[in-house]
Design a protein with these regions (language model features):
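Hydrophobic residues in well-ordered beta-strands that form the structural core
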Residues: 12-14, 146
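Active-site loop of classical SDR/Rossmann-like NAD(P)-dependent oxidoreductases
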Residues: 176-190, 206
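Short aromatic-enriched loop/helix-cap "lid" or pocket-rim segments at secondary-structure transitions
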Residues: 24-26, 50-55, 106-107, 135, ...
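A general structural signal for well-ordered alpha-helical segments in protein cores
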Residues: 24, 79-80, 154-155, 186-193, ...
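Rossmann-fold NAD(P)-binding glycine/threonine-rich loop
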Residues: 1-11
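Contiguous beta-strand/loop segments that form the cofactor/metal-binding neighborhood of enzyme cores
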Residues: 80-154, 190-199, 234-240
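Predominantly a Rossmann-like dinucleotide-binding segment in NAD(P)-dependent oxidoreductases
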Residues: 18-93
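C-terminal helix-rich "cap/oligomerization" subdomain common to oxidoreductases
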Residues: 7, 116, 191-240
């Protein structure tokens, strides 16, 4: 698709709502306040309304591996794409997950290591269980807390209390964003329209490089978990 977009000089952008969200952009602008970043943690676990049918033996589209829409592809990407957008490609990946009876990946937990950044990352995703955990970016000087990584209605900065002042001072949570007054998809569509009107092929936010690197990460997760789709044109054998 990227080759064809270049050939025909058309605009191509991944439809990722998370990173064009104004609150996520605000988070990115304030990352420096965290000091040395030590960990990225993101969770998106949502019990699918179609899972009950699956347990009854009825395979609907949301749990059909023929459609290449397993848990990591469907909702796990919302935890991984922002990580790659902020920190780039990890140096190592260790994935664990649950495969359902038809080979469909129901959920996963993945640990990442960034050697040059001296930080780690962990993501959780599921279509077969709920979680209500917020997501965080943890630094030596403070923590960013994101209520929902995929739509980021609220982003808070919580500074670290200096050593020795824990009894006399309390950390004051600062809201960096505000509840969205428009659908999260509005900002995705606006970014795409702006690119077309400005004659640009590639978004600086949802860039081609970020999309490719995210797919490389997901391919490695799939390789480790043994997730294969009929649409795969080659076996997933490469490692990072």
């Amino acid at each position: 698709m990227m080759e064809r977009a270049m050939e025909y000089r058309v605009t191509l952008m991944e439809a990722m709502i998370s990173t064009v969200n104004p609150n996520f952009i605000k988070l990115k602008e304030n990352l420096g306040r965290l000091g040395k970043i030590r960990r990225y943690f993101a969770s998106y676990c949502q019990y699918s309304s179609r899972y009950d049918k699956f347990k009854e033996g009825v395979i609907l589209n949301a749990f059909n591996p023929k459609l290449s829409n397993g848990s990591v592809m469907d909702i796990g990407i919302y935890t991984i794409y922002p990580m790659v957008a902020l920190f780039g490609m990890p140096d190592s990946i260790q994935a664990e997950g649950v495969l359902l009876s038809n080979g469909f990946d129901g959920q996963g937990a993945v640990n990442f290591k960034y050697d040059q950044l001296d930080m780690t990352a962990t993501v959780l995703y599921s279509k077969i269980a709920n979680s209500f955990l917020p997501s965080e970016i943890e630094g030596e000087d403070g923590t960013m807390m994101i209520d929902q990584i995929h739509i980021a209605q609220n982003v808070d900065f919580i500074p670290r209390i200096p050593t020795g002042q824990g009894q006399s001072q309390k950390a004051v949570r600062e809201s960096l964003g505000s509840p969205l007054d428009k659908s999260p998809y509005y900002y995705e569509i606006k970014e795409f329209i702006d690119l077309i009107q400005e004659g640009k092929q590639i978004s600086s936010i949802n860039s081609w490089d970020t999309s490719l690197d995210t797919l490389r990460v997901i391919d490695e997760i799939r390789r480790q978990l043994g997730i294969a789709y009929e649409a795969d044109v080659c076996e997933l054998t490469s490692k990072l």
